Amino acid sequence: MSSSLRPGPSRWRRAASIVLAAGWSRPETATPPSRPPPAEGFRLLLLQRSPHQGFMPGAHVFSGGVLDAADRSADWLGLFAPHHGPPRFGLGPAPFSRTAFPSLPDTDDHKTDNTGTLPEDVAFRICAVREAFEEAGVLLLRPRTSPPGPAPGPGLALEPPPGLASWRDRVRQDPRHFLRLCAHLDCTPDIWALHNWSAWLTPFLRGTTRRFDTAFFLCCLREPPPVYPDLAEVVGYQWSSPSEATESFLSKEIWLPPPQFYEVRRLANFASLSDLHKFCLGRALEGLERWLPIILLTADGMVHLLPGDELYLEDSDFLENLMSTEKKTEEIMKEGKQFHRIVTYHRHLYDIHVTVQPKYKHVYPKNSVVRKSHL
């Protein structure tokens, strides 16, 4: 196998995303009659990005966006007081910070002076909540008088305020207005409802200039909130269970980028929203492991190598490298045994192969090998 070094290092922009899972225990009442309750008992909010977006145009993704200085501002301290405050804001002991790569470089904002700002795990949660409001009109807020800490069960989103469109326009233009909206509603971002789930870094690909270091949080709601796409970054949405999203992807109704497909398949492990919520609470102290996929180009496809795979090289050269081989994907698969990889045959056909054990009390997807009829 060979690699090709790209001149000049990339930098990742820090970002946060919410995987929003909502209970769905009874049939919908829409006319004409729509889908029955999903087998999993919950559905995920998938937002369709505008085809005019520069990054992943047209993809169905989880809500999220780039961390802004306003998300870390010390101005939030007054809103969280007196019930919630430094050092942990009721989030419990600090989780471990883990990385599966030995020498990840600093992100753009590490060189700024963050003295007096909020802890990172608070700021990332505020960012994720703000983006859910901007993109989907979903308000994950909690009254200021509520006790801190995670709720024993899934919660509810706040009803949209009067003047939703006006508030959203202001927040989109200046994220500092999100603090003002929260103060107006006498609420705080419900950072306690966001559970550590995963963290993905954009791998190196030729022609790709945008790279992100994204923390994914899982939020469980008892029922789906109303969704109002902003019709700018987001042009549509759907609620889909893991099995429904997989089938929509394979039938080319939607396109899921590899990280989203992996997470959808990971969530297929859970039989109910209650099981998922309990699982999140049970691994709250394990933190997020940051994964940097390494791309292996084969003669007839592409393999996203993930930590633990026997071909995954924890070498800083691959921060800016592709791996390549003249062998076909099938040959590569026959040669190995220790797999943690996403095999991409084309835009709407991925296989997931996992033979390694999960770490840090997490779960990995089960092997997901598509029927040959899709080829």
Swiss-Prot record:
Signal peptide start and end residues: none
Site (Important for coenzyme A binding): R49, F55, R210
Residue numbers binding Mg(2+): E131, E135
Motif extent (Nudix box): 116-137
Catalysis: reaction(s): an acyl-CoA + H2O = an acyl-4'-phosphopantetheine + adenosine 3',5'-bisphosphate + 2 H(+); CoA + H2O = (R)-4'-phosphopantetheine + adenosine 3',5'-bisphosphate + 2 H(+); hexanoyl-CoA + H2O = hexanoyl-4'-phosphopantetheine + adenosine 3',5'-bisphosphate + 2 H(+); octanoyl-CoA + H2O = S-octanoyl-4'-phosphopantetheine + adenosine 3',5'-bisphosphate + 2 H(+)
Domain of life: Eukaryota
Family: Belongs to the Nudix hydrolase family.
Protein name: Acyl-coenzyme A diphosphatase NUDT19
Species, as recorded: Homo sapiens
Source species taxonomy: Eukaryota, Metazoa, Chordata, Craniata, Vertebrata
Name of the gene encoding the protein in the UniProt record: NUDT19
